[in-house]
Amino acid sequence: STLSPSSAASDVYKRQEFWNGIKEEKVGIGVITKFDTEDYKVKIAAEVKDFNVKERLDNKAARRMEVFSQYAVAASREAFAMAGLDMEKEDPYRVGCYVGSGIGSLQAMEREHKRLLERGASRINPLLVPLMISNMACGNVSIQLGLKGKSLNVVTACATGTHSIGEAFRSIQIGDADVIVAGGTEAAICPMGVGGLSLIHI
């Protein structure tokens, strides 16, 4: 399942709209709306729009996840449902999770760096590190879906999602798992992400 600029909503209509967009060669890239780009050379991106976390996660779980993890959990739940998987019928120790993120949460780093400068080190969110590190997408998917098999966080920049799927294929092929939730997640459309990537022309 894919969360994309045109498929963030959870209903069947949006998934069909996304697929129709692919067939019709529609572009999901537009002007950045998440922050002011006046001082940036790059002003466009493929933002995920209409993502309502309250429709996807309970409030307690959502508060302990950054956006990249929320995307991963939402897409994984949708993929599970579309595949007709039922954890009550699966051995949880044979169901793994290979969901990677190339960069984790730059938003958390931006937010807490600002707090550090304004209020001092003692005021940094104690959950900063577990919120921002890239393996938390995989960890949160496993927790939310009850997966207890192999867990792997692949970090290979823009190849992360494809690499994760390849590693999952190999693990199933050699008998390490029966089912693996695999893919990649990213939420780097923020001042630091766009600024840094634009300077190296990515």
Predicted feature locations:
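Single conserved hydrophobic/aromatic residue that forms the stacking wall/gate
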Residues: 1-9, 13, 200-201
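Small-residue (primarily alanine) positions within well-ordered alpha-helices
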Residues: 8-9, 79, 164, 168
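Local beta-strand N-terminus motif with an aromatic residue
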Residues: 9, 94-95, 177
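Conserved beta-ketoacyl condensing-enzyme motif
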Residues: 19, 23-156, 188-194
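Alpha-helix C-terminal capping segments
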Residues: 142-146, 167-176
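Short conserved active-site loop signatures built around small residues
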Residues: 161
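Acyl-CoA/ACP chain-elongation machinery
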Residues: 176-199
